[in-house]
Amino acid sequence: MTPERFRSITSRYAGLRIAIVGDFCLDRYLEIDPARCETSIETGLPVHNVVRVRAQPGGAGTILNNLVALRVGRIVPVSFCGDDGEGYELRRELARLPGVELDHFVTSPERRTFTYCKPLIVEPDRQPVELNRLDSKNWTPTPPALAQRLPATAGARRRSSAGMRGRCVV
């Protein structure tokens, strides 16, 4: 592929509208400074002091992040999160991204937001080292009423997108 052909293709990304249907989660990174390690008075176990916390959309949100990086014009996540602090944080991070429309991203009190907490040992001039991950998941099936809302939402989005350039990723 020539550079001109590549630019010709990628220059059209801004005109696309893409829906992403899938499991969105919150990836939360806890950056730990090993120089600040202490010992717990109560338990005698090591205490890993977190010096920075950052979060970003994960799961299907990783695909969304990639589309944002490619400067796709409009991106519509079709999914849900819990009505909890992690859901608030996930929605906030999605809303910060250019071109992301949250009209079809449902908040539900019946579910908790999938959250993957990733402790990282961070030292100067070294790659971060990930410790054991801490996951918060739903261990029961998605309630049928909530599951039924998502296909209806995606169908409404497809009908309202008639005649527009773009694809629905399912």
Task: Indicate residue ranges for each PLM-predicted region.
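Ribokinase/PfkB-type carbohydrate-kinase core domain
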Residues: 1-38, 42, 49-170
